[in-house]
Amino acid sequence: MARKCFITGKKTKAGNNRSHAMNASKRTWGANLQKVRILVDGKPKKVYVSARALKSGKVERV
């Protein structure tokens, strides 16, 4: 299962680390995902939801 927010679609982003000499090395930024139980089609289901979606009230825990 991909590490992706069930509600907002947020997922891992890629980019570069830059050293003092401006050398680039690949790195990733992960979304702040929490595994929570929510109602999906009237049934409880465990899904990954971003912390931002939880804080803004876009999803309600069961």
UniProtKB/Swiss-Prot annotation:
InterPro entries attached to this UniProt entry: Bacterial_rp_bL28, Ribosomal_bL28, Ribosomal_bL28/bL31-like_sf, Ribosomal_bL28_bact-type, Ribosomal_bL28_sf
Gene that specifies this protein: rpmB
Any one GO molecular-function label of the UniProt entry: structural constituent of ribosome
GO biological process: translation
Name of this chain's protein: Large ribosomal subunit protein bL28
Matching Pfam families: Ribosomal_L28 (PF00830)
GO cellular component, one term: ribonucleoprotein complex
The entry's keywords: Ribonucleoprotein, Ribosomal protein
Superkingdom to which the source organism belongs: Bacteria
Family, per entry: Belongs to the bacterial ribosomal protein bL28 family.
